């Protein structure tokens, strides 16, 4: 096929320049990208600062830097072309469309540099009109004036405050320098595979622990990295100044990274690596007791609990004990308290302390028997977070799997029927529970058995106690379908239960009658005053009252 035939049967790519330029307008017309690009241009030009001034009366924004200036205005307004040196091109990778954000941010734009200037509108660029290069009295680096700027002063000020936080050179707004707390030069940190990383609590004196979310900057400007960037909380979070040759911002606004999910994973690895180095150093310099107590939480969150496996001390934060009479839990309730003392491996090995895995009540029927024994035995529960190789794991017992033996002599029994629960009540002499070969006498009532359909529940009450109504909370939460605690119902049931226990304990009949009459409010019945009655109960409890 000859060349002419080939050309007639082939196509090449092309660009509709005017349409392309017109569509760029939709990307930049209301964006604060103009501010970010102006900052970057000033920094690349070697400026020592970038100054922004806004004339509210004229809606005019002036941007001035003292950098090297513009050698060729043509490159400034040519898409995908840059006037930067080859060295800057290689190190900065400018894309070549940033200045168009300036062009579309105002009705007209004036650019002055090295005693020359150009003035144009976005329509001039779209129509590819001739733009004259004229003399200017401005000799410094670069001054850009946006007449009738489409951004108001408030929006400009807010955006600059955000952009300046991590920027490399000073930024001035309306004559005042903006704070740059996250600037690389103002931070202590570590150079990592992802770039420069500052970790509060390690690289400064702030009392904070491991944080998995933080702030990310690319070439000094903030970028959003889904899965890592923090959108809440204060300033005290990790700060990452990414290696911009490795992580490319997404065009045209450069406010996020390409492949943010991978970037977030990389940042997580870098953060955890810094924490591991820090914790290894702390382990070497601190006592075992201080190390586990101070560093356990951070080690857990940073995935470094393997550093704890050979430390012969368990911290208080992983240890709990039954600190009060166990009951069915409602929201916020807990009968488990954190231990006030650490536990050493030596105490566990010697048998002075018994360790159990975390215990979850599952209405097995004897859960509260086990927990009441645990309260008496002062055993400690260890949270599930122990790594599998930790020395304590081999010493952990499972309270749910231990054989339970309940002993004692029944001295009296009856049935209780309340508004929320019912069951047999047994008054016990020498009520004892044996688990793991250790026996303890119980001095409080305990509910055993299940309230499920077809099952029975029994309340075991040690002889000698006078109030045991609280045991009903082991059988029911007394919470209705609206999650409301029915306290009055509980108190009524508890009083009735205590009355039954008193009778089983041998309360004289006259005292029982006196309580019944008192609770019925008979003292307020004026027609009963100065009268005597004979009260009789038959074998079925039927009452007969005769006036005397």
Specify the residue positions occupied by each region the protein language model found.
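Charge-rich (often acidic), low-complexity intrinsically disordered regions concentrated
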Residues: 1-11, 58, 68, 72, ...
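Flexible, glycine-/charge-rich segments associated with ATP-binding catalytic modules
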Residues: 1-11, 109-111, 127-173, 179-180
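Bergerat-fold GHKL ATPase/HATPase_c domain
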Residues: 1-40, 44-47, 73-77, 251-262, ...
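A conserved short beta-strand within the histidine kinase catalytic ATPase domain
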Residues: 48-55
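Short beta-strand-loop-beta element adjacent to the nucleotide/active-site pocket used for signaling
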Residues: 55-61
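Conserved active-site aspartate in kinases
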Residues: 65
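Flexible ATP-lid and adjacent glycine-rich G1/G2 motifs of the Bergerat
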Residues: 68-129
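GHKL/Histidine-kinase-like ATPase module
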Residues: 154-161, 166-275, 304-349, 358, ...
């Amino acid at each position: 096929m000859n060349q002419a035939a080939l050309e007639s049967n082939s196509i090449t790519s092309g660009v509709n320049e005017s349409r392309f330029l017109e569509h760029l307008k939709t990307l930049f017309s209301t964006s604060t990208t103009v501010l970010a690009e102006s900052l970057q241009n000033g920094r690349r030009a070697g400026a020592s600062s970038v100054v922004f001034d806004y004339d509210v009366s004229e809606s005019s924004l002036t941007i001035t830097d003292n950098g090297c200036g513009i050698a060729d205005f043509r490159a400034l307004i040519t898409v995908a072309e840059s006037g930067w040196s080859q060295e800057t091109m290689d190190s900065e990778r400018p894309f070549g469309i940033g200045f168009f954000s300036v062009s579309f941010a105002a009705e007209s734009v004036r650019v002055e540099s090295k005693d020359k200037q150009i003035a144009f509108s976005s329509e001039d660029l779209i129509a590819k009109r001739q733009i004259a290069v004229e003399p200017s009295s401005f000799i410094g680096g670069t001054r850009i004036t946006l007449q009738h700027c489409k951004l108001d002063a408030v929006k400009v000020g807010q955006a600059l405050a955000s952009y300046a936080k991590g920027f490399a050179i000073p930024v001035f707004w309306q004559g005042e320098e903006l704070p740059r707390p996250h600037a690389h030069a103002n931070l202590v940190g570590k150079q990592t595979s992802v770039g420069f990383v500052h970790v509060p609590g390690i690289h400064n004196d702030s009392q904070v622990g491991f944080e998995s979310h933080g702030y990310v900057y690319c070439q000094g400007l903030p970028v959003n990295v889904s899965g890592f960037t923090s959108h809440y909380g204060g300033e005290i979070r990790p700060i990452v100044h990414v290696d911009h040759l490795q992580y490319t911002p997404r065009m045209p606004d450069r406010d996020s990274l390409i492949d943010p999910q991978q970037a977030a994973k990389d940042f997580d690895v870098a953060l955890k690596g810094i924490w591991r180095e820090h914790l290894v150093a702390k382990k070497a310099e601190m006592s075992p007791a201080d190390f586990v107590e101070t560093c356990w939480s951070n080690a857990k969150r940073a995935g470094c609990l393997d550093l704890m496996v050979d430390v012969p001390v368990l911290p208080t934060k992983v240890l709990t004990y039954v600190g009060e009479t166990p009951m069915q839990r409602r929201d916020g309730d807990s009968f488990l308290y954190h231990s006030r003392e650490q536990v050493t491996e030596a105490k566990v090995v010697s048998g002075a302390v018994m360790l159990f895995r975390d215990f979850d009540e599952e209405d097995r029927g004897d859960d509260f028997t086990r927990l009441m024994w645990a309260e008496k035995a002062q055993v400690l529960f260890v949270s599930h977070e122990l790594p599998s190789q930790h020395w304590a794991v081999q010493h952990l017992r499972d309270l749910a799997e231990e054989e339970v033996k309940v002993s004692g002599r029944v001295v009296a029994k009856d049935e209780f029927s309340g508004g929320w629960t019912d069951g047999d009540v047994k008054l016990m002499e020498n009520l004892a529970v044996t688990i793991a070969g250790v026996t303890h006498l119980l001095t409080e009532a305990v509910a055993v058995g299940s309230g499920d359909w077809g099952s029975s529940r029994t309340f075991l009450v040690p002889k000698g106690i006078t109030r045991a109504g609280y045991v009903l909370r082991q059988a029911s939460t007394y919470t209705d379908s609206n999650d409301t605690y029915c306290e009055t119902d509980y108190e009524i049931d508890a009083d009735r239960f205590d009355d039954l226990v008193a009778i089983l304990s041998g309360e004289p009949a006259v005292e029982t009658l006196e309580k019944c009459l008192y609770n019925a409010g008979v003292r307020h019945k004026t027609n009963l005053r100065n009268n005597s009655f004979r009260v009789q109960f038959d074998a079925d409890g039927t009452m007969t009252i005769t006036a005397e």
